[in-house]
Amino acid sequence: MKKIVVIPGDGIGKEVMEAAMLILEKLDLPFEYSYYDAGDEALEKYGKALPDETLEACRKSDAVLFGAAGETAADVIVRLRRELGTFANVRPAKAIEGIECLYPGLDIVVVRENTECLYMGFEFGFGDVTEAIRVITREASERIARYAFELAKREGRKKVTALHKANVMKKTCGLFRDVCREVAKDYPEIQYNDYYIDAACMYLVMDPFRFDVIVTTNMFGDIVSDLAAGLVGGLGLAPSANVGERTAIFEPVHGAAFDIAGKGIANPTAMILTACMMLRHFGYVEEAKKVEEAVEKTIKEGKKTPDLGGNLKTMEFANEVASLLD
């Protein structure tokens, strides 16, 4: 029995989580769900955006399924990533038939190192001068590179591309690039190459089909994964996972969207696909495929939420997907 902590959070997080839970409960898998608070409402209610009770439950869980948070998002999700040691942020960018996008048929994955780089928060100010310390270690670089190659191997993908800026940041990016090249030697069946981050952004816009799995450092990965999402329809359709040695956090990329919260029109696609990533994580690959195919079939038939030009409400869309799982 897998213990899943469910955190709906703020805004549309509650609505899209309800949709995803409808799908998960329909599958009737050996999961034990427990609901906890985190986010803006939790801050107002408990004085903490991430209450101690929630954090403790997350530490004991096999996975966390997270909806969305508002202004306190960084206090919740960034801290959770750190506390749970989720070193890999996995962000697929896959075009869905029936949704207009720049590159139909595109299917790539961005694997982002989640624990170091400039996002460690080592920033200092001296009058009119500020500075930040960038930390890149061999251990974290090897761990994320190996994760990217193992993901490629597991999913039958053929290529891993590392992104860096070693021509300028010779020590930090140089170490990351060199470690990726070393790890690549252990996977001769998988193609490897690397690009400077600026050139890679150009290639992503002009010819994204040259990529398959992208692995990169924390800040570059944050930026490039949003770019990749834009190629296939935007952040509203993008799922993600934060994976550690012992547990994982699964969250849609979109935020709380307070402007549409409570109207019942939020698109739950990203949240449902995020739940599918959790299913795959636990080895329920066929179940995940079944849900993904149901989502794609629903959208292809023109049954969409308003943001995609349709007229279905959040739970109406979820029910359409669920009906295909019978």
From Swiss-Prot:
Location in or out of the cell: Cytoplasm
Entry-linked InterPro entries: IsoCit/isopropylmalate_DH_CS, IsoPropMal-DH-like_dom, LEU3_arc
Gene Ontology CC annotations of this record: cytoplasm
Role played: Catalyzes the oxidation of 3-carboxy-2-hydroxy-4-methylpentanoate (3-isopropylmalate) to 3-carboxy-4-methyl-2-oxopentanoate. The product decarboxylates to 4-methyl-2 oxopentanoate.
Assembly behavior: Homotetramer.
Cofactor(s) the protein requires to work: Mg(2+); Mn(2+)
Catalyzed reactions per annotation: (2R,3S)-3-isopropylmalate + NAD(+) = 4-methyl-2-oxopentanoate + CO2 + NADH
Keyword terms, alphabetized: Amino-acid biosynthesis, Branched-chain amino acid biosynthesis, Cytoplasm, Leucine biosynthesis, Magnesium, Manganese, Metal-binding, NAD, Oxidoreductase
GO biological process, one term: isocitrate metabolic process
Chief site of localization: cytoplasm
Residues noted as binding Mg(2+) in the record, renumbered to the chain: D198, D222, D226
Pfam families: Iso_dh
Note on how the cofactor is bound: Binds 1 Mg(2+) or Mn(2+) ion per subunit.
Binding positions for NAD(+) per the UniProt entry: G255, A256, A257, F258, D259, I260, A261, G262, K263, G264, I265, A266, N267
Site (Important for catalysis): Y119, K165
Species annotation: Archaeoglobus fulgidus (strain ATCC 49558 / DSM 4304 / JCM 9628 / NBRC 100126 / VC-16)
Name this protein carries in UniProt: 3-isopropylmalate dehydrogenase
